[in-house]
Amino acid sequence: ADPDAVAKALARSYHWTIVPCGNTALNLLGLSTQVTAVWSYISDGPYKTYEWNSTKLEFKHRTNKEITGLSYMTSLVIQALKTLGRTNVTAEIIQTLSEKLSEDEKQACLKEATESTDWVYDTIRKMCGGDTQ
């Protein structure tokens, strides 16, 4: 089993909502090819770390507003952008994200990410082909 599947199974069994963050989010979106020894997730559950097949699964508690009401893909995109940081988001990254998401996922992102930081939302608008004002 892959680490992401194990993390999702743990989250299900504990009734946590989880979203990949850090390099894990970048890997899952194809923005990084770096193999990570630690798979990181934000969670509405407690801080927890699990060791599994020489891989570490790390769950970091976050407030619900970073997780609740957001689809998996919207949360994943937001976490990836936050990991990169505003100054590291290039046109190439926006293009990669745009190609990775379906039209439905893009529409969900636009609707759901309105509460995120201004630069994150502006980036999502560009990714979805919206105007950038």
Task: Describe each PLM feature range.
Residues 1-10:
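Short beta-edge/loop segments at beta->alpha junctions of small alpha/beta modules
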Residues 7-8, 32, 59, 63, ...:
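Generic, low-specificity signal for short hydrophobic/alpha-helical stretches with a mild N-terminal bias
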Residues 10-52:
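Short gly/ser-rich loop at a beta-strand->alpha-helix junction or flexible surface loop bordering the NTP-binding
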Residues 51-61:
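A short, charged helix-loop
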